Amino acid sequence: GPGMLSKNYDGLQNDLDKMDGVFLKRGQYTYPLDKGSVWHFVPLVSVGDKVEASAWLGQVDENFQPLKIMVPFTQKGVCTVKSIVPEGDYKIEDVVAVLVDEEGNTVEVNMIQKWPVKRAMTNYKEKPRPFKLLETGVRVIDTVNPIVEGGTGFIPGPFGTGKTVLQHAISKQAEADIVIIAACGERANEVVEIFTEFPELVDPHTGRKLMERTIIIANTSNMPVAAREASVYTAMTIAEYYRAMGLKVLLMADSTSRWAQALREMSNRMEELPGPDAFPMDLSSIISNFYGRAGYVKLNNGESGSITFIGTVSPAGGNLKEPVTENTKKVARCFYALEQDRADKKRYPAVNPIDSYSKYIEYPEFEAYIAEHINDEWIGKVNEIKTRLQRGKEIAEQINILGDDGVPVEYHVIFWKSELIDFVILQQDAFDEIDAVTPMERQEAILNMVIDICHTEFEFDNFNEVMDYFKKMINICKQMNYSKFKSEQYEGFQKQLEELVAERSVK
């Protein structure tokens, strides 16, 4: 019901702010909603209207979000509205509407919804393939491997590769109405970090605190196993509740490996047959059913809502071949591989551009959307930079073996062009005010600029010249990324860049 935004829950939806002490006491439960709060209710239906489960009866405002009060999700068949209260202030347990079902029984409706967390809500008309780009402001995601509204993605990576910073950046900048964070089985200090940092973050879309539209579900690794298993389901169910209101929800789970470990412990205790690595035999179907609950839906009243799900996977020892990563890879459509090597070189975000992928780029619906909203050459250019990065990596290996003199100068040029793509497009400073968020218009300008340089032919006598020249170029481009888009400073750097390119290009 209303009153969940900016709350901190545990995996069983106990309100953590109402509890005291370091550990939860056995058998201690708290009610997740505030029974004393008063909400201003505005009716959306009138007496005699026909309604079904999850139809909107009225709306209340919470933290500037219009939340809908709906017919109970468990209601079967078509009901008729017998009475509805006038606009006014009510508590969550007050009856706001009385319905008559097909058998003539009266159903009293208040603002509270109850639903079992492990069952998916299917109260929508259809679930089309998602197609609308979800802007995150992170170039390595938006430009190279885009995720869509209602899409699924996962981020595997060993410790210290920046999973949490990347998640913070996405949750802060992505175009979502509600953000839900499920900290499932993380170390206690990381959960405390979320509790202390999130209230400080300012929402760039509204200028108010990000916490106003966030729900945190925290389960540290020393909480009971059953709660850890339930926490991810609880988060998904809350997300489905908001999706039924026609809102865009972003759900972040950190980390799904700990959730899978909880599944493993439960199944081992129940003496089920163990599968690979002692995980349950049906791990793949559990994971795919769970990911299948996310998505973009058309509701019965013609509105649309979406759940975009991004889960992190922290495989033991960074081994990407273990069952959780393998099974997640089958169902998630976007894969952002964070790697230790890039993190050690301080190339953040440390997403490996060659191993990572987004299957949405191949969707005809997505191509049509991009052609309409950006331009029709966009996807071709994105594929070109991926090819150039791959080629650059191959040449880097050759240079490593044969030495700088052992390969032709043209090879050095190809390698440095791929480095230019890496430094200018892939790398981004999450702590710089301007560089942290790159709008699509600016990403398009950066991509076009880099592609134009890559298409230019240059003349050099030896490999030292290539290196010095491209380092100068990368430096100017970096300064452009740090300056405000189309400001005087930006234009100045652009002029410098044009002069530098003209200096060496083949006439």
Model segments located where?
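P-loop NTPase catalytic core
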Residues: T143-V144, G150-K472, K486
